């Protein structure tokens, strides 16, 4: 695929990241080697690539199960037994089934665990990300952030970062806000031991999967009142600003509503007797 055709799949404001992504694809295709991105890409990128792109297999890894931000590996067919395609997750058994040597697929990332004493105040995602980005670290070089409380009443932030900046962060990050922090690199061999996302489940009933209908039901605002935040760019679908109130969403879509949080359309639960759609929505907490 030519570069200009590839870039047409993405909004103009994402052309820089899309251009970098194409370069990795080109390396894998031209030199028949596995090519890894250093950056973590959001779903609006890796969903478009699918399982195979331009004759090259696609594997994504964000360390955590169901992660949003993922590094991408472009894997030529020469590294695969048979004509198998790949899914988005790459656990050990999957790699064996597809004939891939685990040592050939070491994504260039490290998982950091950042711990602080939270007995005296509450610390949020924005506190951790603010301190990390205060080191002049770009957001796209970091994956998803998951917070967990430990038995000592400390709060721990787990975040995968590009391998090239991991030592720098370990050396330079001294505190989160005004709280002194401890930081370490975590072994990710056993993914069952890694922290998991926490959700609040909500069953919504909507006339259709139109954006304004779903946002209205999630926020308990009228459809008239949600038009303003949508048109003002306060609603994102798969991390992309979406101003089209009539856009039809799909199961698996991520919706971020400023002031209300992030949600995933998780499962289609069928229709009501009156023909309305029942959808299981998960809110990230």
Predicted segments with their positions:
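Internal, well-folded beta-alpha domain core
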Residues: 215-216, 222, 234, 251
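Short, well-ordered loop/turn sites that connect or cap secondary structure elements
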Residues: 229-230, 249
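Short strand-turn-strand beta-turns centered on an Asx-Gly dipeptide
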Residues: 237-239, 258
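A generic structural motif
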Residues: 232, 260-262
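Ferredoxin-like alpha/beta domains used as RNA- or RNAP-binding modules
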Residues: 1-212, 218, 241, 248, ...
